[in-house]
A protein has these predicted regions:
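Cysteine-dependent deubiquitinase/ubiquitin-like isopeptidase catalytic cores across multiple families
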Residues: 2-122, 126, 132, 138-491
Length: 491
């Protein structure tokens, strides 16, 4: 096996990463029902040793990987965060690279401060859904706080990718005319490094080599601030430490598996409890239904002298999270076209889901393959409390793809609307995308009015700190059986 060091490749590949291990604090438990709090919050010495052993094994497992190459089709469009790219020129590859590398990449970390109530100092092996949720929220915050044309200036070349003509010919080109190959132009910086240096500084592109990026020190400082909010430190508002604390309200503990629906509600509460976000709300759909009245109620809550000029007085921007289930034990192929149409929308900020017990963050697709960011790579903790902490490990230059058929049906879809007009456009565009489903029932729906009018608890500003309400599909009168024990709606 061609194994390389953690600094050599950014991704775990293959099917060996599963997050279905038992909690490190469950040694005394018989495996039936929830683990008693008294056991879990007071780990004894044996539990600590066991947790350290498991953590050490996971650090090794997720810190090394097999080098592979991702191939992109030069004759088919690729969609990334609502934008289309056709790799028929180096300019188009460069445009894609700038957007992809600018995405915030959050992965397993090791050696961070101990999580409260446990002996864990790493989330390796169990925290991938938390990391995927963090990436989804980070994308929403970048849209909310930074200019729409912002690009990260530390432009890394794409690593381990190739661009090929995967079809006999392009309809727009005469027979016999081949497209140029760009693979030689985008060699991995790893292969060009000084083996003893361990640094890619000499191969990093300067701002002058990134003509579309522009430079604004205040914007770059804000970008760094956003990343710091996801740091692995107890004070980081969206870090693993805070999310684990919020998970306790849903009966979860450090070391447990977190489903995409639970993570959606954890993100909602995390944003609501962060004072800096007076101009942003997070809404989580209930029963695969977005109640427009509830969204309006959240967004029309009073603001405190923040941005309201573009969306009407007192209007908050909103991140909408929709937990869904796209099949039974596996993805229903009838929903693939619908998922593609959703990922084509500018208002879509990604999907958290992945393979079974192996969460990924989906940000686009090409043909029948999803484009994703993978959290299953263990990196040393970065001290984000330092003013000039390194951003390199929070951005990825290795795009990865997988077939739609490998996508787990349990997922959460994210959307962002900055203004009231944007929200209205979102409802229209997403509804049109949902209508492309070949199934009788859409993935989810938009409904006028409020959830309480249908017997559900709404998500008003006053209820944001309450426990997450996760509803089953029993109220939806759909004669389908549940395909698993997860708390998602089966379509």
């Amino acid at each position: 096996m061609n194994s390389v060091s953690p600094s050599g490749v950014q991704y775990m590949v293959g099917a060996g990463a599963h997050d279905d291990r038992p909690s490190a604090q469950s040694r005394h438990h018989n495996g039936h029902g929830p683990v008693p709090d008294a056991i879990r919050e007071e780990p004894d010495e044996v539990d600590r040793l066991k947790a350290k052993f498991i953590s050490a094994w996971n650090n090794v497992k997720y810190g090394w990987t097999v080098k592979s190459k991702t191939t992109f089709n030069k004759t088919s469009p690729l969609f990334l965060l609502g934008q289309s790219y056709l790799f028929n020129s180096e300019d188009e590859v460069e445009r894609f690279r700038q957007v992809f590398v600018s995405c915030v990449w959050l992965t397993y970390r090791r050696e961070f401060p101990q999580l409260e109530g446990s002996s864990l100092t790493t989330d390796c092996g169990w925290g991938c859904m938390l990391r995927s949720g963090q990436m989804l929220l980070a994308q929403g915050l970048l849209l909310h706080l930074l200019p729409t044309d912002w690009r990260w200036l530390e432009c890394h070349p794409l690593s381990d990718v190739d661009f090929e003509v995967l079809k006999p010919r392009s309809p727009s080109r005469p027979a016999g005319m081949s497209l140029p190959s760009f693979s030689s132009s985008w060699t991995s910086p790893i292969s060009q490094r000084d083996p003893g240096s361990g640094s890619a500084e000499g191969h990093r592109r300067t701002p002058e080599q990134c003509p579309a990026a522009g430079h604004d020190p205040q914007v770059e400082a804000l970008h760094r601030k956003v990343v710091s909010w996801f740091g692995d430190h107890p004070s980081a508002p969206f870090g693993v430490h805070q999310l684990v604390e919020l998970g306790k309200e849903s009966g979860k503990r450090a070391g447990d598996w977190y489903g995409p629906s639970v993570v959606a509600h954890m993100l909602r509460k995390a944003v609501a409890r962060t004072p800096v976000f007076h101009s942003l709300a997070v809404y989580v759909a209930q029963d695969c239904t977005v109640y427009k009245g509830d969204v309006m109620g959240l967004c029309e809550s009073p603001l405190t002298q923040e941005r309201s000029e573009s969306g009407g007085t007192g209007w908050k921007s909103v991140i909408i999270l929709v937990p869904v289930r796209l099949g039974g034990e596996s993805l229903n192929p009838s929903y693939i076209e619908c998922v593609k149409n959703i990922l084509k929308l500018n208002c879509c900020i990604g999907i958290i889901g992945g393979k079974p017990k192996h969460s990924l963050f989906f940000i686009g697709f090409q043909d029948d393959q999803l484009l994703y960011l993978d959290p299953h790579y263990c990196q040393p903790v970065v001290d984000v409390t330092q003013g000039n902490f390194s951003l390199e490990s929070f951005h990825c230059n290795s795009p990865r793809k997988m077939n739609f058929s490998r996508m787990d049906p349990s997922c959460t879809i994210g959307f962002y609307a900055q203004t009231k007009k944007d929200f209205e456009s979102l409802c229209s565009a997403v509804s049109e995308a949902l209508s492309s489903s070949k199934e009788k029932y859409p993935i989810f729906t938009f409904v006028e009015g409020m959830g309480q009018n249908y017997g559900l608890e709404g998500q008003s500003a006053g209820s944001m700190d309450g426990p997450a309400n996760i509803f089953s599909c029993n109220r939806m009168s759909r004669n389908n059986k549940r395909g698993s024990t997860d708390e998602f709606v089966l379509l």
